[in-house]
C-alpha cells in the first residue's frame, strides 16, 4: 500500500513537471511571437509620424545591389483629386543615410507642415556609393528618377498627380533634388520597366547641395592652395578612362541643366559651410541671372553644414529656414 502511495505521488510530481515544462515552452513561444510581431512597431518609430495615411516600404525598383523602397505619406486632410507629391532625397555624401531621414530633426518639422498643406511626401532610398563598389553618383540620381517614374506609373492606385511633382533634398540629396528638378524626365533612364513614364516637375528646394562639380574651386571654401577634389571617386567609376571624367562631372552638375524655362529652385546655404561652400549658391544665382532662370537663394549667416552654428547663433534661425521652405512649396502649389 505504501509502495502504491509512493508511486502515485511520483507520477503526480512527474506530471506536474512535464506540464510546467510545456507551459514554459508555450510561454516562450508566445513571447517570441510577441517579440516578432513587435518588430514592425519598433521600426515604425523611425518613420515620419503625420497622423495621416502612410504607405511604407513600397518596392519601386530591383537592382543588383538590392531592392529599393520608398515611403509615401499622404496629406492631412486629403484634398479632392490626386495629390501633389514632394520627393525627398536624403543626404549622406551619396554613401550613407536613408529614407528614414524624413522623420528626423528639422525634416520631420518641414514634412509635417507640408502634409498639412495638402502635399504628399515620398521619401526615397537609393543605392549608395562604396569604396570598392560599382555604384556611382549617377546611379543615385537614376534611382531617384525611377522613384518618380514608379509613382507616375502607379499614379491611379496611389492617388498621386504625376503633373505636380516637387523635389527636396539636403547635401548630397540637395544635388539629387536639383537634378530631379532641372533634368528632363527622359534623361538618365534606369529600369526599362519604368522608362518613358511621363511626369512634370513644378519646383524644388535644395539645402546646402552642390550645383557644379566641374568648377572644383567651388568646393574650396577658403581658397586654400593645393586643394584636392574630394568627390571625384563618387562620380567616376573605377576603371573609367581619363577622357570620361569631364563628361561625367558635367552630367552630374545640376547647373548644366538650368534654362530660362526651368522650374523654380530655392537654394539655402550656410555662409560658413566648408563641406558644400556658399559659393555654390552664388554661382547658381549668377548663372540664373544670365539665363533669366527662376532661382532664388537664401544665405544663412554663421551656419555650417546641417545648419550647425559657427562662432555665433545662425541667422536667420532654423525656424525661419523651415518657414521659408514650406512657403516656397505652398507658393508654387497655387496655380498648379
PLM features: residue spans?
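Short beta-strand/loop motif that positions the catalytic acidic residue
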Residues: 261, 267-269, 273
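Catalytic active-site module of serine/aspartate enzymes centered on a nucleophile-bearing elbow/loop
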Residues: 314-336
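Short beta-strand element of the alpha/beta-hydrolase
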Residues: 81-93
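N-terminal cap/lid segment of alpha/beta-hydrolase-fold proteins
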Residues: 33-81
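Mobile cap/lid helix-loop segments that gate and shape the active-site cleft of serine hydrolases
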Residues: 47, 63, 215-257, 263
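Primarily recognizes the serine-hydrolase "nucleophile elbow" in alpha/beta-hydrolase
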Residues: 149-220
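Conserved alpha/beta-hydrolase "acid-adjacent" motif
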Residues: 274-283
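Catalytic nucleophile-loop/oxyanion-hole region of alpha/beta-hydrolase
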Residues: 102-106, 110-111, 116-117, 122-162, ...
Amino acid at each position: 500500500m505504501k509502495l502504491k502511495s509512493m508511486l502515485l505521488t511520483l507520477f503526480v510530481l512527474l506530471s506536474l513537471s512535464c506540464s510546467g515544462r510545456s507551459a514554459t515552452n508555450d510561454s516562450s513561444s508566445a513571447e517570441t511571437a510577441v517579440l516578432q510581431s513587435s518588430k514592425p512597431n519598433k521600426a515604425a518609430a523611425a518613420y515620419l509620424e503625420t497622423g495621416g495615411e502612410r504607405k511604407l516600404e513600397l518596392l519601386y525598383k530591383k537592382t543588383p545591389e538590392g531592392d529599393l523602397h520608398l515611403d509615401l505619406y499622404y496629406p492631412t486632410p486629403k484634398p479632392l483629386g490626386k495629390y501633389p507629391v514632394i520627393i525627398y532625397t536624403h543626404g549622406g555624401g551619396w554613401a550613407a543615410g536613408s529614407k528614414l531621414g524624413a522623420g528626423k530633426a528639422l525634416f520631420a518639422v518641414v514634412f509635417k507642415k507640408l502634409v498639412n498643406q495638402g502635399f504628399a511626401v515620398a521619401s526615397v532610398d537609393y543605392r549608395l556609393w562604396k569604396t570598392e563598389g560599382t555604384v556611382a553618383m549617377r546611379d543615385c540620381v537614376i534611382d531617384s528618377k525611377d522613384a518618380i517614374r514608379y509613382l507616375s506609373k502607379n499614379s491611379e492606385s496611389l492617388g498621386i498627380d504625376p503633373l505636380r511633382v516637387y523635389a527636396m533634398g539636403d547635401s548630397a540629396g540637395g544635388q539629387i533634388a536639383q537634378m530631379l528638378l532641372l533634368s528632363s524626365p527622359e534623361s538618365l533612364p534606369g529600369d526599362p520597366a519604368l522608362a518613358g513614364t511621363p511626369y512634370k516637375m513644378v519646383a524644388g528646394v535644395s539645402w546646402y547641395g552642390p550645383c557644379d562639380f566641374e568648377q572644383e574651386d567651388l568646393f574650396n571654401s577658403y581658397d586654400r592652395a593645393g586643394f584636392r577634389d574630394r568627390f571625384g571617386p563618387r562620380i567616376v567609376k573605377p576603371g573609367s578612362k581619363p577622357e570620361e571624367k569631364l563628361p561625367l562631372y558635367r552630367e552630374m552638375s545640376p547647373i548644366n541643366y538650368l534654362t530660362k524655362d526651368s522650374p523654380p529652385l530655392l537654394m539655402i546655404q550656410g555662409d560658413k559651410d566648408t563641406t558644400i561652400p556658399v559659393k555654390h549658391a552664388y554661382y547658381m544665382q549668377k548663372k540664373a541671372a544670365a539665363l533669366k532662370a527662376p532661382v532664388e537663394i537664401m544665405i544663412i549667416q554663421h551656419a555650417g553644414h546641417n545648419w550647425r552654428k559657427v562662432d555665433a547663433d545662425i541667422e536667420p534661425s532654423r525656424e525661419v529656414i523651415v518657414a521659408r521652405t514650406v512657403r516656397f512649396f505652398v507658393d508654387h502649389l497655387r496655380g498648379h
